[in-house]
Regions:
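Non-heme Fe(II)/2-oxoglutarate
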Residues: 1-98
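Catalytic core of non-heme Fe(II) oxygenases with the double-stranded beta-helix
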Residues: 74-84, 88-198
Length: 198
């Protein structure tokens, strides 16, 4: 189990063949069980939970497991099965015999011509109070660092605990109550797989 405030960064978390399979399905032309991977447009990737504060950063997303406010999310996509081995490896690394997926999704962000390159809004992924672990997997090398803060709730100011640069095969596993965010990519696409487990 991960400790309070703990962050683990592990390169080559899965073997290169599996890394390339995920990459080729999500941002390439490979199919999974004869299905092409569908992406869904969102007006602003920085808006969460009905917030009115928008940074106008369109992106693409794909939900795998939908969070229903209970101890187990509902599977929303056939593509969730693609990530079961990754989640099993995370459970093993955490010393847990099994984990429950509360929420799972991917995001694909593009370089944008923005006037303001402030970081995305700091947030936690689940707001209902479930203790959870974030498993964030980077599909490809990119800019657009993940920034994890020391703070565990909304604050006027934030202090950086750790920055992590996206790199294919890298995973970041951390205490889900740590506020975190992402920088907008400037030079490359930024593609992540983001699961919340307990």
């Amino acid at each position: 189990m991960i400790q309070e405030n703990e962050i683990m960064v592990i390169d080559d978390f899965i073997d290169i063949e599996y890394q390339n399979q995920i990459k080729n399905i999500l941002i390439g032309e490979e199919t999974f069980k004869d299905y092409e991977f569908p992406w869904y447009y969102v007006d602003d990737v920085t808006v969460a939970y009905g917030e009115s504060d928008t940074q106008h950063r369109p992106a693409l997303t794909h939900p795998y497991v939908y969070y229903e406010g209970t101890s187990l999310g509902s599977i929303d996509s056939e593509f969730h099965k693609l990530f079961v081995p990754l989640l099993q490896r995370a459970a093993f690394k955490l010393g847990m015999p099994y984990v429950n997926a509360l929420q799972g999704r991917s995001f694909l962000q593009f370089p944008l011509n923005l006037k303001n390159y402030d970081v995305d809004n700091p947030h936690i992924d689940l707001v209902e109070g479930h203790k959870h672990i974030v498993v964030l997997y980077y599909v490809c090398d990119s800019d657009g660092d993940t920034i994890i803060y020391n703070e565990r709730k909304e604050s006027e100011t934030y202090t950086i605990k750790q920055r992590v640069t996206p790199k294919q095969g890298r995973v970041v596993i951390f205490d889900g109550w740590l506020m975190h965010t992402a920088e907008q990519p400037i030079n490359n696409i930024r593609c992540v797989v983001n699961y919340n487990l307990n």
